[in-house]
Amino acid sequence: MVVAASTCRTETVFDYSWMNVVVAYWNRYPNPSSTHVLTEDTIQREVRDGKLFSRRLLSKTNPVPKWGARFYNNVPVKIVEDSVLDPVKKTFTTFTRNLGMTKIMKVDEIVVYSEQKDGSTLAVRRAYISSQVFGFSRAIRAFGIERFKANGNKASNGFNYVLRRMFPDSLVGGGHHQHAVTTTSPAGELPATTITVSTTNGSLNNQGALKSAAKVGYEFFKSHASKIAQLFSVKN
């Protein structure tokens, strides 16, 4: 069965060093912007090949619109988070996915934190949202995209709150960065540097466009295969 997926990509620059961001990441809950995060537990952690592999289990809750109440009764949802910290390349990659309600809405998210030339830290978030609810898939995916963007803003605000408290005198890059870049695609992420494919109501408009989109998706996942393989290699 082919399941349609919507994607969203956001970029956030934190005016703190990569090391400070990584340290704060493990201490970012609780904060005033994360009341929807109920629990977090580290269930596995190990060092392999000089990299830190971690697996955490979180529970979160979010209110849904009235039309969504028929599918989701607002019970907490378990989230598993795998991460890889590479101190040599100064990258920190997280991969999260929900364990419950996956037929209603499945959200796979990859975030890469990397050091910038001016000493700040760039976080690139990519989410892939799918739904198997017949007749409501498009509406649920659209809701998921908007919720992802809203939660991303909350996460950035909460993260900055923790960074300010932990490292009050450690701003880098002049403290002038803005959180501004967001791109979405109902049919798949289409990097502007590769191919542009026009879409209509979330569907690719012709067979040639479909082939182009498939090529884009293949190239993207091929380029990230090693990271995804590393994340999944954390043993259960």
From Swiss-Prot:
Entry's Gene Ontology cellular component terms: mitochondrial crista; mitochondrial intermembrane space; mitochondrion
Tissues expressed in: Widely expressed.
UniProt record, GO biological process: dendrite morphogenesis; mitochondrion organization; phospholipid transport
Domain PRELI/MSF1 intervals: 5-171
Keyword Mitochondrion: yes
The keyword Ribonucleoprotein is annotated on this UniProt entry: no
Entry's Gene Ontology molecular function annotations: phosphatidic acid transfer activity
Keywords of the record: Mitochondrion
Primary residence: mitochondrion
Subcellular location: Mitochondrion
PROSITE patterns for this protein: PRELI_MSF1
Disruption phenotype: Lethal at early larval stages.
Functional description taken from the UniProt entry: Involved in maintaining the structural and functional integrity of mitochondria. Activity is required for maintaining the subcellular distribution, shape and activity of mitochondria in neurons and as a consequence has an important role in the development and maintenance of dendritic arbors. Function may be particularly important in class IV dendritic arborization (da) neurons.
Name of this chain's protein: Protein preli-like
